[in-house]
Amino acid sequence: MAVYTDINEIELGAFLQQYDIGTLTSYKGIAEGVENSNYLLHTTSGSFILTLYEKRTNREDLPFFLGLMQHLASRGLECPQPVVRRDGTTIGELAGRPAAIVTFLEGMWMRRPTVEHCEAVGEGLAHMHLAGADFSLRRRNGLTLADWRPLWNLSRGRADTVEPGLVREAEADLAFLEKNWPADLPQGVIHADLFPDNVFFLGDRLSGFIDFYFACTDTLAYDVAVCLNAWCFEKDFSYNRTKGAALLRGYTSVRPLSAAEADALPVLARGAAIRFMLTRLYDWLNVPEGSFVVKKDPMEYVRKIRFHRQIETAAEYGLEQQGAAA
């Protein structure tokens, strides 16, 4: 979450007249994240999250995102739910941006995830994949293989200023992925951004997932690969196989991976790493100074890509044989 667009109390008060959520008592911007502008609202009825959708978010995608949250909640998955406006819709406009309010999810994200947290995330992700199986809307992943080279071309000219030799490395990785990207794997609704700051815990119990604004219809095992990148590396960028095994064990206890999915995991993990390297690199070079947003270092994912290049089998990530189904 982040803040790109400032709002004042007068315009916020007018916007809230369209909702039945009580009277505003306070609000504050949320700095974490990189995509939209988010505010924590406190009203006489409780706490809520207000999101103003910035230019990267297509207004036409909002029914998918908000409808997905409603669908998953109806299937028992803990996640924020859109608040319905007085006119029966869930999307309004504030400060010239499309805007929505969702319920506040109790819990905290884990800055130092444990093995147990990783297993819970794997299990929760599998439950989300199953819960989304009958969701009727579809959305193309706008940050997958076909999108990576155009995104790379926006940063290529300055990439070596971030890391000498990065152009050569990235070109080789993209060529490899374009040649080896798997096809015909099981598809469905994926979160696509399930980092630790998008997963809340109450104590050691997973209390829910947030921030579904990259969710889309894509390869389910790619979502697992995103989580391996996000949850199973240490601060020194070394891969923690124990955490990886726990995450994969949690996932496969609910939804076993097919043999084809398991075989594809090293390529999917490398692809997931380059996806986040590319968006971080673009933001690192282009996010305007003064924005109330935390820029994230693309080099974290350059180092993870270097690790994935050495991996040949899913077992090296910690996938146990009994976790894979034919």
From Swiss-Prot:
GO MF term (any one): ATP binding
InterPro entries documented for this protein: Aminoglycoside_PTrfase, Homoserine_kinase_II, Kinase-like_dom_sf, Pseudomonas-type_ThrB
Enzyme class: transferase
Entry annotated with the keyword Amino-acid biosynthesis: yes
GO biological process, one term: threonine biosynthetic process
EC number: 2.7.1.39
Record-annotated disulphide pairs: none
Highest taxon of source: Bacteria
Protein name: Homoserine kinase
Family annotation (NCBIfam families): PRK05231.1, thrB_alt
Organism: Brucella anthropi (strain ATCC 49188 / DSM 6882 / CCUG 24695 / JCM 21032 / LMG 3331 / NBRC 15819 / NCTC 12168 / Alc 37) (Ochrobactrum anthropi)
Pathway: Amino-acid biosynthesis; L-threonine biosynthesis; L-threonine from L-aspartate: step 4/5
Presence of the UniProt keyword Cell membrane in the record: no
Record SUPFAM superfamilies: Protein kinase-like (PK-like)
Similarity comment: Belongs to the pseudomonas-type ThrB family.
Catalysis performed (reactions): L-homoserine + ATP = O-phospho-L-homoserine + ADP + H(+)
Key words of the record: Amino-acid biosynthesis, ATP-binding, Kinase, Nucleotide-binding, Threonine biosynthesis, Transferase
